[in-house]
């Protein structure tokens, strides 16, 4: 098992965690950030950003469909009906998420922050273990910032379904 010591350990690379890690790195502190998924958190990877991209695509499709109607709209006409190819829309959304994720990772790197992929398991108040067995990494820090985000909760009076969606 390898051991890594640092001044600041941030657990969670969502909007709270990566901003804290970047700032610590900018201030010259030896900083490590641990993320179990992709840098950017729920908002960037599967929540706000991808949702807004899909809403924008739906709005654009709706506007184009109006132009495709007989006679067009605003003097703009499109021959034939507007067509949505969902696989193309999803690929476009995924490209946005990938680009922003790479941007967050670049900001961390440029600030001198080490990004470790994995799930942090506390061994004591200032030590975490990532991974298992001989490949595990033990990180000991002087300071620990918990920025592990949130998880969606289904409310008993508002079940997930056709009109209620979750980021999961």
What residues fall within each predicted segment?
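Residues forming the Rossmann-fold NAD(P)(H) cofactor-binding site
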Residues: 18
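Glycine-rich Rossmann-fold phosphate-binding loop(s) that bind the pyrophosphate
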Residues: 12-15, 36-37
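Glycine-rich flavin
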Residues: 2-6, 22-29, 34-168
